[in-house]
Every structure is written in structure tokens, then in C-alpha cells.
């Protein structure tokens, strides 16, 4: 079916490999061979996940970067030259609904800022969360609190911090009994880390992996923050032109 609509390349990853572990050359080659057996090509890796400890500069950062370099080298040996990654703390792309219905009968991913604010203020109960929203938005949150059901609350939690993050080897999995508690702990890892500190951690990471990219001709492609504004009190890394300009000059390398 994909070939029938003109698709030539596939964007995928080794989703079964835990975040931070090495992608074995054999596993990469096996998936590549499978894709090519259907007359397609593995064009882009999305994503080779960057571990949280790399982002917040934890004590295991250097070992995790070494693992990342080995994975990059193995991708290069398999002939895969484009790797997408992101440097968003804790939470990657955010949606409040994975199957939002539309009038024509179709459905799509959806981000509802009021429902997200409800998650932040009422469910997560993040300290100082109210400062990130307007008076009108907070009023809408209070109105939502009068009608939202427990099932809808549970689905909102599941969507924001389990289902969407599972696509990118998230830290919280299906079946975890206390996802909100785990999520709060992950957020706390970034206490005291501002935009400048996150930038320096990204620079450190890129400087470390560029020699491997040079050797194998791999291009590292960063995914912009999604959505491109501050969420949950976390620093952001690629929200607009100024961030992109910083990134292009932070590491002097074409890859």
C-alpha cells in the first residue's frame, strides 16, 4: 500500500531498544533488510533517543554518550546517514488527544491548551503552574473541573505522559501504577537547569558525537520543541529563529 501511494523511504527506529542502550549493528541491519525486502529504503532514523541524564548532565552522562556514539557508528556502517533526535527535557511532543474527531468523520492528533493546563494545575499540581497561564485560561480550567469525569482525567494522564512518550522510548510505560508520581520525579531532575544550562549540555553532547558523524557522514537533525513554547516550567531548546541561529554557531560542523 505504501508503494502504491508513491512512498519510497521509511522513517523509523529500533523502538524495542531501551533508551540509552546500544543499537546493535545486527539489529539495525535486520530492520534495514526487512524494509528493503519491500522495495523501500530506511531513509531516516527517528529517533535515536538522547537519554535524560545527557540532557541534565547527570553522573552517567559520559557513558551514555559513548553508547550513543557506538549506535551512531553502527548506523553509519549500515549506510543510514540521517538521524533525527530531540533535546526536550522529560516530555517530547505533547498531545491531549490522539484521536480527535472532526466533522468529516476523520480524526487526528490534537493539542488542547486548556486540557493541558488542567493536567498541569489540577492533576500534576505543579508548584507555580498558575503563573504560566492567563486569568482567562485559569477560569476555563476551573470550568472544566466541574464537568470532567474520572475516566477523562485518567485518559488525559495516559495520553500526555504514557502513550505519546512511548513513541520515543519514554521513561513511563503502560502498566506503571503511579505515572504522575514518576513524572513529578522526572521533572525534579531539571530543578535549577535553565535555558543556558540546557544549551551548554546540548553543545557538550554534539561536540562529543561529531567525530563519529564526520567519520560516517551522518547528519544529526534536531526536532524543534513541540509545542514551541515553555511547558511545565521546563527550559526549551529549539523554539524559534534565535535558538536555531545559536545551534548553528554552537558547534562548528556541517553534520
Q: Where are the regions a protein language model picked out?
A:
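Surface-exposed, active-site-proximal loop segments in enzymatic domains
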Residues: 19-22, 48-66, 91-105, 184-193
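Hydrophobic or amphipathic alpha-helical targeting/insertion segments
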Residues: 61, 67-93
Amino acid at each position: 500500500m505504501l508503494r502504491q501511494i508513491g512512498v519510497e523511504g521509511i522513517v523509523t527506529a529500533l523502538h524495542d531498544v531501551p533508551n540509552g542502550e546500544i543499537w546493535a549493528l545486527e539489529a539495525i541491519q535486520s530492520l534495514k533488510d526487512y524494509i528493503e525486502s519491500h522495495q523501500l529504503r530506511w531513509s531516516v532514523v527517528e529517533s535515536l533517543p538522547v537519554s535524560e541524564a545527557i540532557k541534565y548532565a547527570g553522573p552517567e552522562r559520559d557513558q551514555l554518550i559513548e553508547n550513543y556514539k557506538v549506535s551512531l557508528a553502527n548506523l553509519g556502517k549500515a549506510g543510514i546517514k540521517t538521524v533525527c533526535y530531540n533535546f526536550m527535557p522529560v516530555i517530547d511532543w505533547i498531545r491531549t488527544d490522539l484521536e480527535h474527531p472532526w466533522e468529516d468523520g476523520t480524526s487526528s492528533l490534537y493539542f488542547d491548551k486548556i486540557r493541558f493546563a488542567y493536567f498541569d494545575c489540577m492533576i500534576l499540581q505543579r508548584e507555580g503552574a498558575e503563573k504560566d497561564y492567563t486569568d482567562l485560561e485559569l477560569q476555563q480550567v476551573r470550568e472544566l473541573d466541574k464537568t470532567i469525569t474520572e475516566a477523562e482525567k485518567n485518559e488525559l494522564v495516559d495520553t500526555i505522559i504514557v502513550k505519546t512518550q512511548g513513541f520515543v522510548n519514554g521513561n513511563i510505560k503502560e502498566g506503571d501504577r503511579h505515572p504522575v508520581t514518576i513524572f513529578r520525579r522526572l521533572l525534579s531532575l531539571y530543578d535549577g537547569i535553565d535555558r543556558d544550562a540546557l544549551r551548554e549540555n546540548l553543545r557538550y553532547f554534539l561536540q562529543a558525537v561529531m567525530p563519529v558523524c564526520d567519520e560516517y557522514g551522518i547528519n544529526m537533525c534536531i526536532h524543534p520543541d513541540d509545542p514551541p513554547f515553555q511547558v511545565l516550567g521546563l527550559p526549551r531548546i529549539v523554539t524559534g529563529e534565535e535558538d536555531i541561529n545559536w545551534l548553528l554557531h554552537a558547534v562548528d560542523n556541517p553534520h
